[in-house]
């Protein structure tokens, strides 16, 4: 079992960092390749992450050829032959995002069986919106013993209103609707950049998807989809994590190829704090003087609101800003587990329902801590950079799901950080 060791107290990050392709984009893109009954689909700018290997194995388990070339960050998928209709439990159980294969398998085969997914233990994160949407399109859904079986000889276009703009449900229903008879309208759809990226791929494959990035999606079904080539967008959450890292260490960092528009909700809060954030030709530059930063109030919301996947990292920034800040989590319940670990490092905080109050600017000390989920693992490492002494972060399986060589990138920026194997 690996662990990360951080020596903190005087860290000041500077330099340039390269951002990978987006984890939250590539997983549904890989699911979408299932829909291509003609030709090969090539995805470029694919990040080397454990979740990508897991999704590759989910798709491969459907008797689909998947070739991942790590040297050039490319995945080639050939789903042109007959495919199986049951996703392999061994891999689906590891990752929540694997539920997005349900819609593509059903649309392609008329029958699909997928186990309830695994992943980070953040609240209940129900999948009822996925299932209700498919039922509205004519699917019969049966849930028995942790397995979901969906049947529909041919999905029918429908008008679907989602009670909450779920990203995963929007993606699942988008993909299913591409091969349905007639027109499907999804109202109160998710608007994240990853939704737009998926719509672009689907249209490149021959689909007819309109409205991506707005609250209303209109998908006109077609008879079949074909392979294509598509570049995965940059990871806005990784970019945001390095923006926060620069801000909390009084750093000066260029986040190369980061997309300003994708990160606008986070950038607006950094600017409100007093962080200097500027768009440059090669990316986004973040400069900061922690002693001059002001506390802020943040509320996570579906895009274009502040991203829930940046909540833990922003908490780490709040910890070094003098005064009382607050952060409200409205997307997922039970997503403050990292605060208990940060308290071991001297963080003063309290939680009232869905809001955490952070008393920042007080001394932090290194400690042994454990990652509780993917983004919390990054937050603990960032906190370790500004805490006096040595911090050891364990349970790195979470980190590897969403960050590629995170410790190496931080080290190149000036952090005293290493990753070691623990017997």
UniProtKB/Swiss-Prot annotation:
GO terms for cellular component: cytoplasm. SUPFAM superfamilies: EPT/RTPC-like. Its EC number is 2.5.1.7. CDD domains: UdpNAET. It catalyses: phosphoenolpyruvate + UDP-N-acetyl-alpha-D-glucosamine = UDP-N-acetyl-3-O-(1-carboxyvinyl)-alpha-D-glucosamine + phosphate. InterPro entries: Enolpyruvate_Tfrase_dom, Enolpyruvate_Tfrase_sf, MurA_subfamily, RNA3'P_cycl/enolpyr_Trfase_a/b, UDP_GlcNAc_COvinyl_MurA. The keyword Aminoacyl-tRNA synthetase does not apply. The keyword Transmembrane does not apply. GO terms for biological process: cell division; cell wall organization; peptidoglycan biosynthetic process; regulation of cell shape; UDP-N-acetylgalactosamine biosynthetic process. The active site is at residue 120. Its main location: cytoplasm. Cell wall formation. Adds enolpyruvyl to UDP-N-acetylglucosamine. This is UDP-N-acetylglucosamine 1-carboxyvinyltransferase 1. The lineage of its organism: Bacteria, Bacillati, Bacillota, Bacilli, Lactobacillales.
């Amino acid at each position: 079992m690996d662990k990360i060791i951080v020596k903190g107290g005087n860290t000041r990050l500077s330099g340039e960092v390269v951002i990978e392709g987006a984890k939250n984009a590539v997983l549904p893109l890989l699911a979408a390749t299932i829909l291509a009954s003609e030709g090969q689909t090539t995805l470029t700018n694919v990040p080397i992450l454990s979740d990508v290997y897991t999704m590759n194995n989910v798709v491969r388990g459907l008797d689909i050829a998947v070739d991942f070339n790590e040297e050039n960050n490319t995945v080639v998928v050939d789903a042109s032959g007959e495919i199986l209709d049951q996703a392999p439990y061994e891999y689906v159980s590891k990752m929540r995002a694997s539920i997005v294969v349900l819609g593509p398998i059903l649309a392609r085969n008329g029958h699909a069986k997928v186990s309830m997914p695994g992943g980070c233990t953040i609240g209940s994160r129900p999948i009822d919106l996925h299932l209700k949407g498919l039922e509205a399109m004519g699917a019969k859904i049966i849930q028995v013993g942790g397995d979901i079986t969906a049947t529909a000889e041919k999905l029918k276009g429908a008008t679907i209103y989602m009670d909450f703009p779920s990203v995963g449900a929007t993606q699942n229903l988008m993909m299913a609707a591409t091969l349905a008879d007639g027109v499907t309208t999804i109202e109160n759809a998710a608007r994240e950049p990853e939704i737009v990226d998926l719509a672009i791929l689907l249209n490149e494959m021959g689909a007819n998807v309109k409205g991506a990035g707005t609250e209303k999606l209109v998908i006109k079904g077609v008879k079949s989809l074909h392979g294509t080539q598509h570049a995965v967008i940059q990871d806005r959450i990784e970019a945001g994590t390095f923006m926060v890292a620069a801000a909390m260490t009084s750093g000066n960092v260029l986040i190369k190829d980061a997309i300003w528009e994708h990160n606008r909700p986070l950038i607006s809060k950094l600017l409100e704090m007093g962080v200097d954030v500027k768009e440059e030709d090669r990316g986004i530059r973040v400069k900061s003087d922690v002693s001059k930063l002001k506390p802020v109030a943040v509320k996570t919301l579906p895009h274009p609101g502040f991203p829930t996947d940046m909540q833990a990292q922003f908490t780490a920034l709040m910890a070094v800003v003098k005064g009382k800040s607050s952060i409200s989590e409205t997307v997922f319940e039970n997503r403050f587990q990292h605060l208990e670990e940060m308290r071991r490092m001297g963080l003063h905080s309290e939680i009232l329902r869905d809001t955490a109050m952070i008393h920042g600017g007080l001394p932090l000390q290194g400690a042994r801590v454990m990652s509780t989920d993917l983004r919390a693992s990054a937050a603990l490492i960032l906190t370790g950079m500004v805490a006096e002494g040595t911090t050891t972060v364990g349970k790195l399986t979470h980190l590897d799901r969403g960050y590629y060589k995170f410790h190496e990138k931080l080290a190149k920026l000036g952090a005293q950080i290493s990753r070691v194997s623990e017997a």
